[in-house]
């Protein structure tokens, strides 16, 4: 932990947070790309962090991008987009590009521009690529949308048949509370 960089932004589509600083420890929860975590301490290759929903758990240090308070404030003030499809890829070119990162519903990336029907975005650690405009939505617009019970049900029902993972909170694998989190 450093006082200069007390925050981290999850830089992977999904990061598993564990009850202890080792891969064999029980999974506590998951955090997805763009989630800010407060760094409490470092333990070897792990960081003990607190998530916005108050979980305290360990994340591999290489799963997050460590930042200052000013960088976190700038991230929060930037134009950001949220992934609104179950899974997609951030590609290095608008059409048929190489994968820069996989993405899942709820991932948050910073807006960098537009090329035709593709939005140029950057991951928290600065990797840039393109996503079709139909697969993302401006975060401020998404956050202010009207509650839609039918859409929530549609998302939940679409998850039927997906794999189960204790502590899972993404469209790849969920547990019961993760299903609720993904659906809303």
Segments from the language model and where they lie:
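Boundary regions of SH3-family modules and the immediately adjacent low-complexity/disordered segments
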Residues: 1-6, 51-85, 94-99, 105, ...
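Charged, low-complexity interaction regions that mediate assembly/partner binding
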Residues: 1-13, 32-35, 41-42
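Beta-loop motif signature
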Residues: 10-33, 83-111
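Residue-level detector of beta-strand face positions
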Residues: 16, 48, 89, 120-122
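Short, conserved beta-turn/loop elements at beta-strand boundaries and strand-helix junctions
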Residues: 22, 41-45, 114-117
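Solvent-exposed, acidic/flexible segments
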Residues: 24, 30, 102, 145, ...
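Short, solvent-exposed loop/edge-beta patches enriched in aromatic
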Residues: 38-47, 53
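Catalytic cores of peptidoglycan-degrading enzymes
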Residues: 149-184
């Amino acid at each position: 932990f450093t006082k200069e960089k007390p925050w981290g932004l999850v830089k992977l589509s999904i990061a598993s947070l564990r009850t202890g600083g080792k891969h064999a420890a029980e999974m506590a929860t998951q955090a997805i790309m763009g989630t800010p975590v407060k760094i409490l301490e470092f333990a070897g290759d792990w960081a003990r962090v607190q998530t916005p929903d108050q979980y305290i758990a360990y994340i591999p240090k290489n799963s997050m991008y460590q930042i200052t308070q000013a960088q976190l404030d700038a991230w929060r003030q930037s134009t950001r987009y949220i992934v609104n499809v179950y899974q997609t890829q951030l590609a290095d070119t608008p059409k048929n590009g190489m994968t820069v990162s996989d993405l899942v519903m709820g991932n948050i990336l910073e807006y960098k521009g537009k090329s035709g029907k593709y939005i140029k975005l950057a991951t928290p650690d600065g990797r840039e690529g393109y996503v079709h405009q139909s697969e993302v939505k401006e975060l401020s617009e998404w956050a202010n949308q009207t509650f839609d019970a039918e859409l929530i049900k549609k998302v939940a029902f679409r998850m039927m048949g997906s794999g189960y993972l204790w502590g899972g909170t993404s469209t790849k694998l969920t547990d019961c509370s993760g299903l609720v989190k993904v659906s809303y």
